[in-house]
């Protein structure tokens, strides 16, 4: 089986082999590539052709090795989309969700439609780049494009289409758009109308597990392409070996997404006030979670400072005084500033914290601030669910940052398990195995993951630094500019 896992910063083609008798699961990286952003006519767009080419090269490599493939699945980030004309050809380039075209659009939508009405219909967190606001911006700023559009596909649906020639709309990713009605599981006609787009661009999203079509290889293979849980976090959570019903997960990467699984969505006033999202998951479950800006801040800072040795930077940051400088990572100023280091410094200066000047000071500021925000979100989630979080499972690339994860354990006062690193890839494979009938369900698959990919564990330290600075951070996190409220 092949899992094509596309994150916001990079993509990978991974080969998985499963041996049912021993319930052994192995992964092999076929290729890894950077997901590039280009600037075209003043807009930041994804180089979707380069992404597709990298995928095809990975598949061709496996085909040339003579490996018989059972299935293929693609997962990616949410909200971004591709427009197709009546001939199935792409119209323009998919715009990057951090592009500035949506500035002010969400606030106008909340004023016109009412925040309560939008949240009640969708149960989705208010994020300025949600597809709802991207489409409203498109219809306002480039209405001439709309007449030629026949279909809108989210990124993994588009890439599945390119491999198979078949259209598909998958539920878990569709749920991120803030266009899906949480009661019906179908596109909300009133929200589509506000976005300025017709319903015939879409079909009702299907749950993960169906075969979309087939990829035909140069050597004559006809490989089923499966609609996995195509939102990367939905796949990551599918593979998270949660120890009990009260455990929470933290999918840690460019974004940090902290939440828990629920059989029903939480769309009451308290959930809305906490800006909690109810995204679709596997087996009809809901991912009740909150988006946190995550390692995006560190990625941008290290790019600007041209730092390649991340382990050394983390080691240097660990030697800095704790909580010397704090920011609110979910402040909207950090979505896509021209210069991240300068923006962090300005935020510290404005709130009378010492200004971090060195790379180590900047990194420590980011790590301490993320740990504080993790604590705040964990408390919000526990309050919403009505019982404490028993354990936190950190999955994804960020689970390799043991220093940050120890800060998270300390700040939250929780035992933490780290792994698997390739959680989205493994969740993608899990959907395929369930679809192929090789694995019974998500619970069964999580046992397989836990047995094949050992976890690492951390316990919280008695850390007075966080307690001493908690009130300072709370004052930051209550500022009205917090991300998307």
Swiss-Prot record:
GO terms for molecular function: ATP binding; glycerol kinase activity; rhamnulokinase activity. Pfam families: FGGY_C (PF02782), FGGY_N (PF00370). Disulfide bonds join 348-365, 408-412. The active site is at residue 232. Gene3D superfamilies: 3.30.420.40. Involved in the catabolism of L-rhamnose (6-deoxy-L-mannose). Catalyzes the transfer of the gamma-phosphate group from ATP to the 1-hydroxyl group of L-rhamnulose to yield L-rhamnulose 1-phosphate. This is Rhamnulokinase. It comes from Yersinia pestis bv. Antiqua (strain Angola).
């Amino acid at each position: 089986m092949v899992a094509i896992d596309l994150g916001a910063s990079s993509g990978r083609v991974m080969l998985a082999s499963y041996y049912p008798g021993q319930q052994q699961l192995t992964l092999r990286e076929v290729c890894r590539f950077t997901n590039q952003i280009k600037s075209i006519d003043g807009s930041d767009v994804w180089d979707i052709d380069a992404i597709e080419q990298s995928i095809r090269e990975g598949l061709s490599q496996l085909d040339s090795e003579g490996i018989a493939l059972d299935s293929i699945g693609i997962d990616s980030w949410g909200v971004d989309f591709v427009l197709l004309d009546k001939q199935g050809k792409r119209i323009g380039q998919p715009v990057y969700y951090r592009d500035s075209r949506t500035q002010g659009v969400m606030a106008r939508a909340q004023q016109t439609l009412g925040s309560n009405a939008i949240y009640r219909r969708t149960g989705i967190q208010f994020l300025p780049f949600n597809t709802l606001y991207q489409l409203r911006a498109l219809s306002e700023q480039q209405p001439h494009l709309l007449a030629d559009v026949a279909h809108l596909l989210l990124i993994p649906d588009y890439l599945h289409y390119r491999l198979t020639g078949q259209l598909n709309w998958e539920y878990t990713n569709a749920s991120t758009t803030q266009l899906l009605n949480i009661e019906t599981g179908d596109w909300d006609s009133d929200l589509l109308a506000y976005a300025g787009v017709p319903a015939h661009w879409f079909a009702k999203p299907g749950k993960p597990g169906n075969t979309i079509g087939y990829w035909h290889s140069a050597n004559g293979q006809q490989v089923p392409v499966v609609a996995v849980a195509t939102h990367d976090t939905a796949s990551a959570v599918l593979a998270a070996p949660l120890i009990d019903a009260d455990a929470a997960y933290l999918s840690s990467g460019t974004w940090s997404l902290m939440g828990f699984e629920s059989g029903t969505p939480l769309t009451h006033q308290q959930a809305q006030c906490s800006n909690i999202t109810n995204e679709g998951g596997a087996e009809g479950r809901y991912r009740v979670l909150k988006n946190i800006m995550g390692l995006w801040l560190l990625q941008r800072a290290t790019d600007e400072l041209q730092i390649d040795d991340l382990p050394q930077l983390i080691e240097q940051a660990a030697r800095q005084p704790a909580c010397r400088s704090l920011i609110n990572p979910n402040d909207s100023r950090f979505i896509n500033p021209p210069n991240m280091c300068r923006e962090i410094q300005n935020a510290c200066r404005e709130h009378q914290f010492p200004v971090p000047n060195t790379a180590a000071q900047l990194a420590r500021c980011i790590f301490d601030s993320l740990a504080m925000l993790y604590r705040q979100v964990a408390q919000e989630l526990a309050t919403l669910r009505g019982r404490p979080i028993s354990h936190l499972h950190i999955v994804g690339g960020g689970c390799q940052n043991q220093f940050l994860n120890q800060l998270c354990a300390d700040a939250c006062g929780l035992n933490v398990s780290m792994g698997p690193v390739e959680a989205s890839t493994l969740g993608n494979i899990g959907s395929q195995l369930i679809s192929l009938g090789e694995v019974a369900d998500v619970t069964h698959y999580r046992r397989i993951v836990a047995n094949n990919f050992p976890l690492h564990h951390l316990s919280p330290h008695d850390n007075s630094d966080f307690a001493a600075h908690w009130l300072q951070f709370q004052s930051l996190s209550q500022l009205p500019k917090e991300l998307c409220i």
